[in-house]
Curated annotation (Swiss-Prot):
This is Translation initiation factor IF-1, plastid. Belongs to the IF-1 family. It comes from the Eukaryota. InterPro entries: NA-bd_OB-fold, RNA-binding_domain_S1_IF1, TIF_IF1. The keyword Chloroplast does not apply. The keyword Protein biosynthesis applies. SUPFAM superfamilies: Nucleic acid-binding proteins (SSF50249).
Length: 78
């Protein structure tokens, strides 16, 4: 599948599941079952419940996706 065919969305991790799977609540209210991308796995980036993430999903199955980026938390000084 080509990169431009994927749908990018943002949401919050609500649940951590076995085998690096996560349940993410998107900004539009939908629940998505996601796994982490290879780059996140290779760089040992920790994803915990409550983190904001960017998810890409196929237009054919919007209930599954892949976490491609963990967004930075806003600092308390901002």
């Amino acid at each position: 599948m080509k990169k431009q065919d994927l749908i990018d969305m943002e949401g919050v991790v609500t649940e951590s599941l076995p085998n690096a799977m996560f349940r993410v609540c998107l900004d539009n209210g939908c629940q998505v079952l996601t796994h982490i991308s290879g780059r996140i796995r290779r760089n040992y980036i920790r994803i915990l419940p409550g983190d904001r993430v960017r998810v890409e999903s196929s237009p054919y199955d919007l209930t599954k996706g892949r976490i491609t980026y963990r967004l930075r938390a806003k600092s308390s000084t901002d």
